[in-house]
A protein has these predicted regions:
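Conserved, mostly hydrophobic/aromatic
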Residues: 6, 33, 78, 82, ...
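Catalytic pocket-lining loop regions of alpha/beta-barrel enzymes
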Residues: 118-119, 129-232, 258-260, 288, ...
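Short beta-strand segments
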Residues: 4, 50-53, 94, 181-183, ...
Length: 304
């Protein structure tokens, strides 16, 4: 089972990143996910993905509706995709406390109960708040996450507000909530991968997202972290998921580039770890080429 924790389909050009070309909509996303991607000599697809709007589309613009209506508007296309392709897309609710912390918490609960959302996204840089100081802004949503076992994905890797350790106060206050350190603490403006690593080492409810991590570092970290502590996420688009799958596949090779990881361990990293966290049925790696080819259409082909 391959599950991407970090996808951004959109039906309009992103307000912040302003990627050129046509919008990277759900259908383009599915085509990208279908690959196929060669993993240890077998063709694979990304079976499922957690989807969220591009963060630039979740801030207030003149003319937007306010409060819960505005939140529902920026989540509308993601909600539509989760209902149109329920076997491929899982909802990730973007929580912007500047629309009102209680409004966001109520909308999170609505999306969980009505549409099966299983994840929440925090992006303190894009939404402009200090996570270590704005605890009253975060608590309402975290209480909902605790109630419904919603996993929290945190954008990290650049200042001023998304250095990983700035989230320690809320993480420690909610030990019953699982947190993913997005990008393994790395962005174009910073590298906090060792902070992310030590947070995952020291804190039971923290795991790290593989995407953006340097290849030479992820093998170093994977050797020391418990196997359940790494999940696969690509931040696509603009990233291309094949390179991040290859980064994990390399762990199956001998040292120093790899760590002789077995295929079951690789499958945990690529999808089964996040599946267990979110209550999704897991699947073992395909044993044969024929089984792998069947899995390109049916994620559970050959699974008892």
């Amino acid at each position: 089972m391959i599950i991407d924790t970090h996808l951004h389909p959109t039906n309009l050009v992103d307000e912040a990143w302003r990627h050129t070309g046509t919008p990277f909509n759900g259908e383009r996303m599915l085509k990208m996910m279908d690959g196929p991607y060669m993993i240890n000599g077998k063709p694979r697809r990304i079976d499922m993905g957690f989807i969220q709007p591009p963060p630039g589309n979740t801030g207030y613009r003149d003319g937007n509706r306010m409060g819960r209506d505005g939140i529902r508007d920026y989540m509308a296309y993601i909600t539509e995709l989760t209902q149109r392709y329920p076997d491929r897309f899982i909802g990730n609710f973007t929580y912007n406390p500047r629309w009102g912390p209680e409004n966001g918490a109520l909308e999170l609960e609505f999306h969980v109960k009505e549409y099966g959302f299983k994840m929440l996204k925090l992006h303190a840089n894009m939404h402009g708040y200090r996570p270590d100081r704005a605890l009253d802004w975060l608590r309402p949503a975290m209480k909902v996450c605790a109630k419904y076992n919603v996993v929290v994905l945190i954008h990290t890797g650049d200042g001023p507000y998304t250095i990983p350790t700035m989230f320690y106060p809320i993480i420690r206050e909610f030990p019953m909530v699982n947190f993913i350190i997005g990008h393994f603490g790395i962005q174009t403006g910073g590298n906090y991968s060792f902070e992310a690593f030590w947070m995952a080492m020291d804190t039971p409810n923290v795991v790290c997202e593989s995407g953006w991590c340097f290849q030479s570092r992820i093998v170093e970290f994977a050797k020391q972290l418990d196997r359940k502590k790494i999940v696969f996420g690509t931040d696509s688009p603009p990233n291309e998921p094949g390179m991040w799958l290859r980064e994990l596949e390399v762990l199956c090779s001998p040292a120093p580039q790899g760590m002789d990881l077995d295929e079951d361990g690789l499958e945990d990293y690529m999808g089964n770890n996040i599946a267990r966290m979110c209550g999704i049925k897991t699947s073992p790696p395909p044993k044969t080429m024929a089984e792998a080819e069947l899995r390109l259409k049916d994620s559970y082909a050959g699974v008892q």
